[in-house]
């Protein structure tokens, strides 16, 4: 009834996967399922703090829904990919012609992406790294990097390290958000990925997440 598609866990992730599958089936019988799933994903977009105000680094992203109360880059990528694919499916259906389509707040999404990209000048997230080797890359969510962190001994400031798979997720999210390729945020993540390009490991993570890294790189 609420549009989600899951078996009791990983609600947003599984809904997004299912929505993508329904979106590539050229059959109008699934239009209602697609619309309801889109609405559930749009309604799950994180808005902490004051509602309607981008006052938290997690605002604008999407999370597991059933597991954590914050957004992360993996779930966000799945959500935005599903929303764009289903948007195309609805546009190509005569049954959906001229009907309003529930959508994400794409500007809020850009706020979340800024909170996860190591470009501190673009966000007020205090955990972003100022180290040149991290510049432009992405972290898992505003408070965590799977590649770990560096703590300044004097200031005790935490800097979250960029890593490969999630930086590809960030680059793809910019594409789905239709951020221009010449935008400095896009250029920065492409530069980081180029500087850290390898097929031997998931940069910053070693062998962990290697096949996911390949999967996103191939896309």
Specify the residue positions occupied by each region the protein language model found.
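An alpha-helical repeat/solenoid feature that recognizes helix-turn-helix modules
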Residues: 1-39, 43-219
